[in-house]
């Protein structure tokens, strides 16, 4: 009796860590590569530092399936990323475009670097 229960317990614990694998059929390997490339460029809105391929969050799974279906429909990378950006905002892009809202993000490092160079130059000039 105990051997049977122990066997069942071991059998069920072997599969306790199994995860759902996301499978999707593509017409050709190029479409699959395009879909994986696009999904790796988009950030999960729920998981701050994971792309759509790495995240298992429900929103990432939904977005990943949307990318796959749009690739299967023949949409281009620009169209898919544009659609995702329109729906979820610039946050989903790892490389946000240069706009009025993101100008501070792009310019701040340069301004800080120039400011530090100016401070160092003035300190050395006084010596």
UniProtKB/Swiss-Prot annotation:
One Gene Ontology cellular component annotation held by this UniProt entry: plasma membrane
Please tell me where this protein is predominantly located: periplasm
Where does it live in the cell?
Periplasm
Q: Which GO terms describe its molecular function?
A: metal ion binding
What positions does the entry give for heme binding? Answer: 44, 47
Superkingdom of this entry's organism? Bacteria
Could you tell me which InterPro entries the record lists for this protein?
C-type_cytochrome_biogenesis, CcmH/CycL/Ccl2/NrfF_N, CcmH/CycL/NrfF/Ccl2_sf, For-dep_Cytc_NO2Rdtase_NrfF
Taken from the record, one Pfam family name reads CcmH
Q: Which cysteines are joined by disulfide bonds?
A: none
Q: Which keywords does this Swiss-Prot/TrEMBL entry list?
A: Heme, Iron, Metal-binding, Periplasm, Signal
Signal sequence span per UniProt? 1-27
- Return the NCBIfam families for the record: cyt_nit_nrfF
**Function of the molecule:** Not required for the biosynthesis of any of the c-type cytochromes. Possible subunit of a heme lyase.
Q: Name the protein family.
A: Belongs to the CcmH/CycL/Ccl2/NrfF family.
Q: What is the recorded name of this protein?
A: Formate-dependent nitrite reductase complex subunit NrfF
Provide the species name.
Answer: Escherichia coli O157:H7
Q: Mind giving the lineage of the organism this protein is from? A: Bacteria, Pseudomonadati, Pseudomonadota, Gammaproteobacteria, Enterobacterales
């Amino acid at each position: 009796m105990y051997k049977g229960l122990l066997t069942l317990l071991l059998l069920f614990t072997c599969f306790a860590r199994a995860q759902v694998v996301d499978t999707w059929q593509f017409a050709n390997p190029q479409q699959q590569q395009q879909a994986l490339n696009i999904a790796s460029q988009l950030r999960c809105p729920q998981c701050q530092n994971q792309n759509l391929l790495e995240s298992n969050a429900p929103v990432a799974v939904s977005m990943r399936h949307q990318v796959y279906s749009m690739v299967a429909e023949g949409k281009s990378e620009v169209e898919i990323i544009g659609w995702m950006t329109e729906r979820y905002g610039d946050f989903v892009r790892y490389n946000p475009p240069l706009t009025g809202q993101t100008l501070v993000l792009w310019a701040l490092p340069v301004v800080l670097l120039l400011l530090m160079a100016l401070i160092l130059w003035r300190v050395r000039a006084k010596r």
